[in-house]
Amino acid sequence: MIGSPSALPALVDLLGDADREIAQAAQESLASIPGTKVDAAIMAMLADGTTDRRITAMDLIVRRRMITAIPALIDTAGGTDAKLRTVAVNKLGELAGPAELPRLLDLLAKAQGSEDLEATEQALSAICLKAEKPDSSVGLVEARLAQAQPAQKCALLRVLGSIGGANALRAVRGAVSDPNAEVHATAIRVMGGWNTADAAPDLLELARTATSPTDKMICLRGYLALAGHGDLPTDQRLTMCRQAAPLALKDDEKKLLLAALGGIASV
């Protein structure tokens, strides 16, 4: 029967069938058949197959929730094939947990291009958010900032932004003063996209002291976006708008202020 372990060799062969429907049906069967023999066959595909076959193996690893395959995925993510690296990192984002965070941070440090960086950043964010307390990941991520190259540092800042919380906010706020222009700009953007009100005082101060019109606009927009949060008390939202009013000098800035005020029911 096609759904039994005895069909395993035939199903593995059919994965490479020229008919896509047949190949897909074989993959669906392999995803559902229980047992360690199927797991072993999938691991063999990952270790010694064509690029397409290895990608299929990684798909099956995630679908079968093969946690024991995480070390092999990490090895693949650090390999020489760019396509396999990206797929492996994406699958780690789906399958790995907080325990693998240090290894993913190592992969980020060695990322060889924009695709590797983006994939690893997304996987890191996904893994951190799986933690019972995502804030517990901040220390490990922040510890990599000091020695990271600018591109990696920017990715780490975005990961911290996805985690959120007071500790992550402090780390991102500190990076605003980084001498590297790219890192500074990323820190400003992450601050401007913060979605909890604990960032409001920093955003207001940054908007007041910004020497760049772009920085000011990003911080003012972020601050007024927080003022628009309906879960904040009306009085607090009004106070925030009043504090921002002296900064709204240009038409675009005034529009942001008016939009925030317009969302407050009592105004």
PLM region descriptions:
Residues 4-16, 35-47, 66-78, 86, ...:
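Amphipathic alpha-helical scaffolding segments comprising HEAT/armadillo-like alpha-solenoid repeats
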Residues 6-8, 19-28, 37, 52-55, ...:
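A generic tandem-repeat structural signature
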Residues 18-19, 49-50, 80-81, 112-113, ...:
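Short inter-helical turns and helix N-cap capping residues of alpha-solenoid HEAT/ARM repeat scaffolds
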Residues 26, 57, 88, 120, ...:
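Conserved hydrophobic register position within alpha-solenoid helical repeats
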Residues 99, 115-118, 214-217:
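Nucleotide-sugar-dependent
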